[in-house]
Amino acid sequence: MRKIYQRVLLKLSGEALMGSLGYGIDPAVVQGIAQEVAEVAATGIQIAIVVGGGNIFRGVKAASKGMDRATADYVGMIATVMNAITLQDALEQVGVPTRVQTAIAMQELAEPYIRRRAIRHLEKGRVVVFGAGSGNPFFTTDTTAALRAAEIEAEVIFKATKVDGVYDSDPHKNQEAKRYESLSYGEVLTLDLRVMDSTAIALCKENNIPIIVFNLSVSGNICKAVMGEKIGTIVGGFHESKRS
């Protein structure tokens, strides 16, 4: 495979890891992700991953039912670490050296997040999985993905979802839903498309980091996306300058 990127960030939602299960982690899904990441890493592309925790706990949902929001968000951060360690194990079982770095210190389980160390791991060919979000309540893991991408100077964010791009309405509920091939950051916000939250979009725009949204459930899509094949929807980047 011919690589077009040097360093990328893959954003995985917690829900993506549970596959067809109603809760938790589907081992087959995690193993499939690990195999695809291994294929990409073998080409020399540097890969960092930010993983969510919604398959185990959702802070916003818990807060809506009376739990203190900050406390709920911290519990959600711990859930992301559970996913990160699971992903690390799956990657190492297929021969990919992997490090987990967390924004909240958990020295018995993972390294603390240190930007320079993360970059050094990437340069050595290791996959780095970021857990515990940004370490701050009230911020989503999408915002964490944008932040970490900017910090490690990733060229692009690949956001893995359950649909093949960004639509003007829910394609599961509306058969007439239209899929966008490309969007500007401004269009995402103006049309309220919820690709990522507004803070994440603002960070990507400020740092000119394109976002490619694609369907994780299709086997081979991680490789296709990272190798530059046209799939899903691209937000910002080259398409942003064309619309300005």
Swiss-Prot record:
GO MF annotation, one: ATP binding
Origin: domain of life: Bacteria
BP GO terms, sorted: 'de novo' CTP biosynthetic process; UDP biosynthetic process
Record's subcellular location: Cytoplasm
Reaction catalysed by this enzyme: UMP + ATP = UDP + ADP
Keywords: Allosteric enzyme, ATP-binding, Cytoplasm, Kinase, Nucleotide-binding, Pyrimidine biosynthesis, Transferase
Assigned GO CC terms: cytoplasm
Family from the record: Belongs to the UMP kinase family.
Cited function: Catalyzes the reversible phosphorylation of UMP to UDP.
Family matches, as NCBIfam families: pyrH_bact (TIGR02075)
Protein name: Uridylate kinase
Annotated source species: Trichodesmium erythraeum (strain IMS101)
Native organism taxonomy: Bacteria, Bacillati, Cyanobacteriota, Cyanophyceae, Oscillatoriophycideae
